[in-house]
Amino acid sequence: MSVKPTLSKPIGGQDASSPAVVMRRLWPYVKPLVWVLVAGVLAMAAVAATEAGIPALLKPLLDHGFGSKGDMTTKLYVPAAVVGLALARAIAQYASGYLLQYVSNRILLDLRIQMFERMIHTGVSFFQRETASTVINAVVFEVNQVLSVLMGVMITLVRDSLTVVFLLGYLFYLNWRLTLIVAILLPCIGWLVGKINRRLRRLNREHQTLTNQLAYIVEETVGGYKVVKVHNGESYEIGRFNELSRKLRGYSMRMTVSGGLAQPLTQFLASIALAVVLTIAVVQSSNDQTTVGGFVAFVTAMLLIISPLKHLMDVNQPLQRGMTAAELIFGLIDEPREPEGGGKPLARASGAIEFSHVSFSYGISRDGRQTLDDVSFTVAPGEMVALAGPSGSGKTTLVNLLPRFFDPSSGTVRVDGVALPEYSLHDLRNQIAMVSQDVVLFNDTIAANVAYGQTPERDGVEAALRAANLWETVTAMPDGIDTLVGDNGMRLSGGQRQRLAIARAIYKDAPILILDEATSALDSESERHVQAALETLMKGRTTLVIAHRLSTIERADRILVLEGGKIVESGSHRELLEQGGLYAHLHRIQFQQDAG
């Protein structure tokens, strides 16, 4: 299955993501720490300056310190200066490492927190569009690539660039003619880096896409392991995984080939320059234009400049990985938030619901049909309304409009006579409790799951568990309500997970309930107890019930039958059976299945 990571996109309103664009986006995070950063850069500058100090000490030692006639002062101060230089370098190196690590980790913390906050406040469409593996990859792993850029790349760019500048300055001081030969290298290297840089950027983006696809295959296989095993799908999944892994390896090798060209080509150009320098230096020495100390100092400085140049060449690959990671990170940060709604407060709703000419579509379909088409109905406070109809008729979409998971394409949804966008989104959702057929539990205690989003009160948790027919089961557990339920409640049975989700809705005590196939996972005995608890709970509360099993909704005050996104029938269970329409047809089919 091909999954394109739609989070990855150019950032900052530019045609392409570049280091300059990324730095502009990072500036708000860097600004509060700018003086710490400046101190770190100054410490790096001190480290870079010590590189030029090494050949600078060699020249007087060779010119004035060697031999029986050598200057004693030079013989003494040069070794002492070497020790002092090494000590200063060590202190500056430690200071720069600590200060830059402080800055980068603080930025990493701020980025990761902002990414998670933005993710959790995005609309439902974001979670439908993106795979979990892509989002996890961006929040947990890709942000570390930016840390790599902030640390490794920044240290390399600043420290080694300054080292090159200091060494070039010293070379000009020693012999400007020879230095011009070295300087010719730099434009050649810059052109070479630019060519390799563009190719690496493209390869890194494609590599990131394949990495997300590989993570998605693992996510699917782990999540659907039962289906994989019962259908003997191991060979198919292994084949998918191996094929994509080989493609990923191919891209990695292409990146290695492209990135690895920079260093040997740089060394080759440097060797040509060294050969020319040696030739000219020999000619100058014959004319007494240079000394042995000056020549050795020049060659030493020139050789010392090669190492930081290599580092600057090697910075391409991590830099391009960082740019690709930045696209994911800022792509997530730039995701639009859910609308916060109006400023109208809603302490506790009476529960009156109105759908007025509501239409909704997830996108443009080939036949132009909408998921919901001009739906209108009202629900009185405390009324229980059931939604029935064949699969795909729009039942779940309809109830998803109530907590504003989506907004209608046209028409208005009202609670207590007020359009939903006028309410604060937080206040609106406080009025709604939902139990879905896809039970979601968190890897926490039973009490924390029951009171999710609120402060757990043991008496309230116990009452909710009793109402959901789960209290005796919980008290039999070693840690009671403090028992950890595991990943999505894997330590509980299917029926226990369903009842725990119902207990969560009971604990919330919201005036509006949405029950989406709420008892479908229960055995007959548990369903009987839970149904009784739900009937008690629903008294005085507005309830919307979705069920594929019609027996669940027979006792509803009113049943709305949907087909093709429209309400085609409305009435009580008995009235709809007497009409002999779609509801009666569905009831007859299910009755025959149950009898069979």
From Swiss-Prot:
<dbReference type="InterPro" id="IPR011917">
    <property type="entry name" value="ABC_transpr_lipidA"/>
</dbReference>
<dbReference type="Pfam" id="PF00664">
    <property type="entry name" value="ABC_membrane"/>
</dbReference>
<keyword id="KW-1278">Translocase</keyword>
<feature type="transmembrane region" description="Helical">
    <location>
        <begin position="138"/>
        <end position="158"/>
    </location>
</feature>
<feature type="transmembrane region" description="Helical">
    <location>
        <begin position="164"/>
        <end position="184"/>
    </location>
</feature>
<protein>
    <recommendedName>
        <fullName>ATP-dependent lipid A-core flippase</fullName>
        <ecNumber>7.5.2.6</ecNumber>
    </recommendedName>
</protein>
<keyword id="KW-0813">Transport</keyword>
<feature type="domain" description="ABC transmembrane type-1">
    <location>
        <begin position="38"/>
        <end position="321"/>
    </location>
</feature>
<feature type="transmembrane region" description="Helical">
    <location>
        <begin position="34"/>
        <end position="54"/>
    </location>
</feature>
<dbReference type="GO" id="GO:0016887">
    <property type="term" value="F:ATP hydrolysis activity"/>
</dbReference>
<dbReference type="Pfam" id="PF00005">
    <property type="entry name" value="ABC_tran"/>
</dbReference>
<dbReference type="InterPro" id="IPR003439">
    <property type="entry name" value="ABC_transporter-like_ATP-bd"/>
</dbReference>
<comment type="similarity">
    <text>Belongs to the ABC transporter superfamily. Lipid exporter (TC 3.A.1.106) family.</text>
</comment>
<keyword id="KW-1003">Cell membrane</keyword>
<comment type="function">
    <text>Involved in lipopolysaccharide (LPS) biosynthesis. Translocates lipid A-core from the inner to the outer leaflet of the inner membrane. Transmembrane domains (TMD) form a pore in the inner membrane and the ATP-binding domain (NBD) is responsible for energy generation.</text>
</comment>
<keyword id="KW-0445">Lipid transport</keyword>
<keyword id="KW-0997">Cell inner membrane</keyword>
<dbReference type="GO" id="GO:0005886">
    <property type="term" value="C:plasma membrane"/>
</dbReference>
<comment type="subunit">
    <text>Homodimer.</text>
</comment>
<feature type="transmembrane region" description="Helical">
    <location>
        <begin position="80"/>
        <end position="100"/>
    </location>
</feature>
<dbReference type="InterPro" id="IPR017871">
    <property type="entry name" value="ABC_transporter-like_CS"/>
</dbReference>
<dbReference type="GO" id="GO:0034040">
    <property type="term" value="F:ATPase-coupled lipid transmembrane transporter activity"/>
</dbReference>
<dbReference type="InterPro" id="IPR036640">
    <property type="entry name" value="ABC1_TM_sf"/>
</dbReference>
<feature type="transmembrane region" description="Helical">
    <location>
        <begin position="292"/>
        <end position="312"/>
    </location>
</feature>
<feature type="transmembrane region" description="Helical">
    <location>
        <begin position="263"/>
        <end position="283"/>
    </location>
</feature>
<dbReference type="GO" id="GO:0015421">
    <property type="term" value="F:ABC-type oligopeptide transporter activity"/>
</dbReference>
<feature type="domain" description="ABC transporter">
    <location>
        <begin position="353"/>
        <end position="589"/>
    </location>
</feature>
<keyword id="KW-0812">Transmembrane</keyword>
<dbReference type="InterPro" id="IPR003593">
    <property type="entry name" value="AAA+_ATPase"/>
</dbReference>
<dbReference type="GO" id="GO:0005524">
    <property type="term" value="F:ATP binding"/>
</dbReference>
<keyword id="KW-0067">ATP-binding</keyword>
<dbReference type="InterPro" id="IPR039421">
    <property type="entry name" value="Type_1_exporter"/>
</dbReference>
<dbReference type="InterPro" id="IPR011527">
    <property type="entry name" value="ABC1_TM_dom"/>
</dbReference>
<keyword id="KW-1133">Transmembrane helix</keyword>
<feature type="binding site">
    <location>
        <begin position="389"/>
        <end position="396"/>
    </location>
    <ligand>
        <name>ATP</name>
    </ligand>
</feature>
<keyword id="KW-0472">Membrane</keyword>
<keyword id="KW-0547">Nucleotide-binding</keyword>
<dbReference type="InterPro" id="IPR027417">
    <property type="entry name" value="P-loop_NTPase"/>
</dbReference>
